[in-house]
C-alpha cells in the first residue's frame, strides 16, 4: 500500500501514480504510469516484471492488468490528503499571482535500494509526481535508467527530483556506468552526476544508492 503522504495533486481533479522496480541480476524491470485506481502501484510494477513479457504498462491498460492480477482497486479519493490539497491550492494561488511556485523534492517520492544475501541489487521508486504538473505528464520514476536503475555489476539507484532533467541525463544509468566503465566509487559517481552534471544543466534532486560491496550513498 503506497503511503498516502506521497500523493501530489495535479492541476486536474484527479491524479496519477508512477512506480518502477528493477532487479540487477538479469536486468529485469517492471513499471507503471498513469494509474489512478490501483491500491498498490508498486505491487503492480512487480507483477509487470514477473508476470508479463513487458517492461512498462500505462493508464487503462495497466489498471486492467492489475485487475487480472488480483491487485485491489480503490477510488482515486483513497489517496487524497489535506496536506496535498493545501499544497495544490498554494501552487495555484502563486501561479495566479505571477509568483514562481516552489516545489520541494524532498517529499513525495519513496525510494528503496537493496543488496540481498545473494549479491543481487534491486531498486524501486514510487511517486505521485510533481505538484501542479500538467495532466498526462510522466516523470522519471517509471523510466528505466532515469529515476530507477539496478545492475549487479555496479549499483542500484533510486532518484527523486525534477524528472525531466533526470530523464534527459539518464541519472540512474549514468551513476552505474561511471562505476562500471570509469572505475569511480559509488559516492564519487553519485556526486559527479547529482552535484555537478545535474546542477550545471539546471536540474535539482537527489538519489539513494547501494553498490555490490554494500556501500551506501545518499546525495
Predicted regions and their residues:
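Zinc-dependent deaminase catalytic domain
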Residues: 106, 114-117, 122-123, 142, ...
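Short, glycine-/Ser/Thr-/acidic-enriched flexible segments
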Residues: 26, 120, 128-129, 162-164, ...
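Single conserved hydrophobic/aromatic residue that forms the stacking wall/gate
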Residues: 2-13, 17
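Residues in well-ordered beta-strands of folded domains
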Residues: 20-22, 113, 158-160, 208
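Internal active-site segments that recognize and position negatively charged phosphoryl groups
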Residues: 94-134
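C-terminal binding/interaction regions
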Residues: 15-19, 26-107, 173, 184-219
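Conserved mixed alpha/beta catalytic, RNA-binding, or beta-rich assembly cores of soluble enzyme
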Residues: 127-168, 174-179
Amino acid at each position: 500500500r503506497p503511503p498516502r503522504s506521497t500523493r501530489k495533486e495535479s492541476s486536474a481533479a484527479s491524479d496519477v501514480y508512477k512506480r518502477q522496480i528493477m532487479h540487477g541480476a538479469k536486468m529485469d524491470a517492471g513499471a507503471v504510469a498513469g494509474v489512478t485506481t490501483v491500491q498498490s502501484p508498486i505491487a503492480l510494477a512487480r507483477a509487470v516484471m514477473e508476470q508479463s513479457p513487458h517492461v512498462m504498462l500505462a493508464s487503462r491498460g495497466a489498471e486492467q492488468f492489475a485487475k487480472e492480477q488480483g491487485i485491489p482497486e480503490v477510488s482515486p479519493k483513497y489517496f487524497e490528503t489535506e496536506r496535498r490539497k493545501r499544497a495544490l491550492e498554494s501552487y495555484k494561488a502563486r501561479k495566479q499571482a505571477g509568483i514562481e511556485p516552489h516545489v520541494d523534492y524532498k517529499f513525495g517520492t519513496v525510494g528503496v535500494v537493496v543488496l540481498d544475501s545473494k549479491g543481487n541489487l534491486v531498486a524501486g521508486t514510487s511517486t505521485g509526481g510533481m505538484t501542479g504538473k500538467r495532466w498526462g505528464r510522466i516523470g522519471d520514476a517509471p523510466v528505466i535508467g532515469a529515476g530507477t536503475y539496478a545492475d549487479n555489476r555496479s549499483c542500484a539507484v533510486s532518484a527523486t527530483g525534477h524528472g525531466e532533467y533526470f530523464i534527459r541525463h539518464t541519472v540512474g544509468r549514468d551513476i552505474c556506468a561511471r562505476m562500471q566503465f570509469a572505475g569511480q566509487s559509488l559516492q564519487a559517481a553519485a556526486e559527479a552526476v547529482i552535484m555537478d552534471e545535474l546542477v550545471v544543466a539546471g536540474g535539482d534532486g537527489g538519489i539513494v544508492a547501494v553498490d555490490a560491496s554494500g556501500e551506501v550513498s545518499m546525495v
